Each structure stands twice: as structure tokens, then as C-alpha cells.
């Protein structure tokens, strides 16, 4: 089959015309997402002996590809696949014992939701976490998971001087000083503790390296093992499963916040995405951690007309702004909604964030245009890069690096699945010469050679006089060469619910709504006009933990 990240192989054991078991031999799907979908679908197929089964919401591509792969295996076994696909339908069903009362209900099963739920549960409260998709993780799983952490252990080992104050300055400057300095201070001062919480409470493992994200003044971003946020979600899911007073309910979309007679939030109305049944979850406090609205084109256009359907998105299909809709319906204030970020280097066909282009963040690649020229400083802010790319021929940019960079960083081996997929689709090319690489994308080869020669001279001189490259300069002086195309896609919505430093949601008069808290991308006014890379992880785990703690305190 062909899933989101390339091909995978399955083994189907058939006896007397029935499937006995399904084994996934080789899969490159996102850990905690595609693999979970395949496991659940396997059970449906084997238990019901049919290929007429539902996919898993949030992993639609992986689901369809897996079902097709099982069908291919059945064909090889001599079965009539068309007959298997017309057998009685088998769908997933709700759990039989869904708890409808809790001390704290958390809406959203991404990083912020897990941080809030685990924190509140560890405080002794009964917690129910609702996730509308059939898989957990949201945008956290789809991200690289890198986390801005001043004073981290790698900085200390490498002698990098940094501080929470410096991170706060970078974040405020990176968002044109629109973000709330007090909220930014909370993130900057809390992210080191949050990274340690992930390590010791969550069991998250880290690479022994840092990335230099655009807009930061120093290299400070730690990297989860595997260079993916799914490392965090898989480990947090495991930890949550060990806590007796924490229940996770998937395929349950929260639709409405419930208030009691005093005006305090006292629960959530929800709808099963499987059965359509209505549920009400009574609670003494609610934490909204259900992400932004990057996948909701109508909401994007409502607040920023430029962000229409011509622009693809890196976000989870679940990023629909549900929390904003529910909270604003009871008077919560929305703030900074017009500020929508695009990530500069995304798959031009699907909008997916390109992990191989982290070569730029490893300070080993340059960005060029159709004319073969550099057009921006590669480590500038995301909005600066995106706007620069949009103004190039075809609204497209191209990333260039060489084999030495690939070998030294190990990035292509780390993301071999993505690389293979991109190569098959012609989005990336490996060539022995610059001329050959340029020809693949019809880039001006002579100008590209001049650009590389000029860049190599900058590296020797120690100064980029064109765009003032901020990291250590490097040469691209020998092949093979790699070149890939990319364009910006919607990645993050800076606007959201107005919150206090205690994660309390404010109403339009500026008063806190009793019993309602928010954390992560659903909460706004932290990033200003633009978010610096790796600050989202710092935010979601810091404010997620605060929201869980404050909700537990409110319950008493």
C-alpha cells in the first residue's frame, strides 16, 4: 500500500477462505497515528471477515491505503476482493462504559491536552479527556516536536549562553511586539521545567543535538527522538494509560460548553463521531486544548481574506477552531484572529511540512529561486521567508544542499520515508552536478552555479554580504547535490481565546469565566503577528500544565 509517508507491506494469513491474522511487515506511517489506525482496522477486518470497514478519522489516507494493501494480499491468496468489499459493513463503535461525570474535562488530545489531563489527574482529580478524531496527537504528532528551551543540557554542554529573558525578547520581537509580554514571560520561564516534565513524567527521549530556528538569536531548540512530535504523544499516551483516574474518549466531538446557575462552566456537550449519539459530560472545570483553525478555510477567510483555499495547510484535519466557536458562544473574547502563519517550506502538492528541509535549520542548506538566485536569509522569520517565497516566480522556492550535509546531519536517513516519497513524485532530485539538478526544475543553471560560488566565498570570508546569514557559514563545494521544491502552507493560527497567566479564559469584559481554562493554539495573544519555530512546544506543555493545575485547584 501507499500511505502518507510512502509504501508499506502487509502479510495476510488466510485459512479456509478466512483471514486469521494481519501483520504489518514494513510501514512508514506516523507513530501513534497511522500505526494505530492500521491496528484498529486489522481488528475490524479479522473480527468481521470483511473489507467493507470504516477508516479511522484523522488517518484517512493511511486507513484507505491499508485496506487496499490487505485487498492486494487477498488477491495474491486467490480470493475475490470485490466480494470481500461488498460484504456486510463493519464499523467502529463507542466504548460501552463512557464516563459522563468528572472533576475536570479536557477537550483535545494533543500535547496541551495531555499536559493538562495528566497534571490534573496527578493532583488527584477524576479527569476525562475528549478527542474528536479516532487518533490522538493532533498537530503535535504532525510536528517535528522541537522545543525552545533556554538553559537546556545541550546548551550547557556546548557552552551556549542563553536565558529565559533572551527567549522572551526573541519571541516578542519575532511577533512584532504584539504578543502579551506577561504570557510570553510565562512560556519563556516555564519551558525548561516543561522539558524536564516531558522527560521524567512523560518518558520522552531526546536527540543529542539542537536546531537553529529562524528568528531566534541563539541555537536553543531541543529535538525529540526521531525528529517528530509523535515521540511525545506515544509516550504521553502510555503515561496517561497508567493513571487510573484519567479516561480518554476518542471519536467524541465537543459541541457546546455548559454553564451552571452561577455562570461557571460545568461541563461539555458532545457528539459521538461513530454513532452520532449525544452525550453530556458534567464537570467542575473544563480545559480547552483543541488547537487552532488552520484547516478551517471559512474561518481563516473570515479573519484574513488572504488565507483562502488556494493555500494548503500543514495542520491536522481536526484543526477546525471548535474551541473558539464553543467558548465565544458563551461570551469568551477572541484576540489576534487575523494573524495566521504559513510555514515556508512545504510540499507544493499536499501542503505537508517537509522534514527533509530541516537541512535549513541544521544550517546546511541555501534557498534559491527559479532564476538560480538566493532571495532571503535562510534563518529569518517564517513570515519573512513565506512572503519572500510568494513573490518568486511561480510562488515557489528551492532548497539546495550536498551529500556532505546529508552525511553530517543524518537527516535524510532520519526521514528516509519522506525522501523516497518526494523523490518518486519529482519534488526532490539528487544529481552529480548542479547543472543536472537545475535542469530537473528548469532553474537557470549558470546563475545557480554563480550563486553557489558566491556563497562558498562568503563561507571562506566568514561574512554573507547579501543577506547577513546569522549562523556559521558552510560551503557547498562538491556533489552529489540535492534540490527540492517547496511553497508556503498555513501552519499556525496566532489568534485565539484571551487568557490570563493562569490559563483562565477571559470574557469580552475582561473578567475570567469561572471554571474555564485554555492552553495551546486555542489560546491567543502569546505569539503576536508571527510565531517563532519551536515556541509552540514550549507553549503547549507550559500552559497545558498550568491549565491542568489551575483546573484542579478550582475543583478544590
Predicted feature locations:
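Glycine-rich loop(s) and the adjacent beta-strand/alpha-helix scaffold that form part
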Residues: 274-277, 281-347, 546
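Helix-rich C-terminal "cap"/substrate-channel and partner-interaction subdomain
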Residues: 44-47, 52, 394-482, 550, ...
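Helical element adjacent to the flavin cofactor pocket in flavoenzyme catalytic cores
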Residues: 224-284, 324, 328-330
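An anion/pyrophosphate-binding glycine-rich loop and adjacent beta-alpha core
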Residues: 324-326, 332-443
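N-terminal Rossmann-like FAD-binding beta1-loop-alpha1 element of flavoenzymes
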Residues: 99-129, 552
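A glycine-rich dinucleotide-binding beta-alpha-beta segment and adjacent secondary-structure elements
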Residues: 256, 447-530
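Conserved N-terminal/central alpha/beta ligand/cofactor-binding core
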Residues: 126, 135-247, 251-254, 365-374, ...
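Active-site- and interface-proximal helix/loop "cap" or "latch" segments in soluble metabolic
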Residues: 1-88
